[in-house]
């Protein structure tokens, strides 16, 4: 690119809400484009057709210190939308994942998660390796989204998905496992069952205005200078391009 004035266009479609985008010149912040605050208070009509993205993660489960033979878990599930299933981003970390039978409003999946035998100390790697998806769906605020995971079936409206995140634990299975391995022990606390249960985390959905950013401005580019963009999402993820 020749030095001088140029028109810079930024177009980002992220997997979650964008916090800000930074334009750096020679590794020094030149301009900050703040996206947070531009969409949170927008009103959505009851009959409005909207697009949202939300992340579903699978993992956690029995601690290897207590259950040494419970290192692998296979999951079977599906997602059905009363509307449209627009896109699916795979957030996979290990082998053994499968997405299939994808249609305009549904999909099926087979996932495999692994528990590491590392200590999990705060200075070391985590014992948990999660797998998941980012789903983009379209519908009205009251459109139903059905997530099936193993023997469980969860129903949410898009409106409910946008309110908060949720963790769904396979709690009874954790109790049954403890009884099978250690025998039935009555105790006033249930921490052990909760912490050793397999869990599905459904992160809070965000509307399209949150994860899409378009920006344009004229910049004066200097010869020999390095320019790059750094995108930061509200969930802490960072990406960059130069």
Provide a role label for each language-model segment.
Residues 1-242:
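C-terminal functional module detector
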């Amino acid at each position: 690119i020749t030095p001088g004035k140029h028109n810079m266009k930024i177009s980002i479609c992220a997997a979650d809400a964008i916090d800000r985008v930074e334009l750096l010149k020679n590794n020094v912040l030149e301009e900050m484009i703040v996206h947070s605050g531009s969409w949170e208070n927008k009103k959505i009509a009851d009959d409005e057709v909207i697009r949202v993205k939300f992340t579903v993660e699978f993992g956690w489960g029995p601690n290897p210190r207590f259950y040494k033979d419970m290192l692998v878990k296979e999951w079977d599930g599906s997602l059905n939308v009363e509307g449209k299933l627009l896109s699916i981003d795979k957030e996979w970390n290990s082998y053994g994942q499968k997405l299939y039978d994808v249609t305009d409003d549904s999909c099926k999946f087979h996932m495999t998660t692994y528990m590491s035998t590392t200590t999990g100390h705060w200075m070391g790697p985590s014992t948990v390796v999660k797998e998941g998806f980012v789903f983009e769906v379209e519908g009205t605020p009251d459109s139903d989204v059905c997530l099936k995971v193993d023997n469980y079936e969860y129903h949410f409206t898009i409106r409910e998905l946008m309110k908060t995140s949720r963790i769904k634990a396979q709690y009874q299975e954790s109790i049954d496992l403890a009884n099978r391995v250690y025998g039935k022990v009555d105790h006033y606390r249930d921490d052990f069952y909760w912490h050793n249960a397999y869990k599905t985390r459904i992160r809070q959905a965000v509307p399209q205005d949150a994860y899409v950013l378009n920006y344009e401005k004229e910049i004066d580019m200097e010869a020999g200078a390095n320019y790059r963009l750094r995108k930061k999402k509200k969930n802490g993820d960072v990406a960059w391009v130069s």
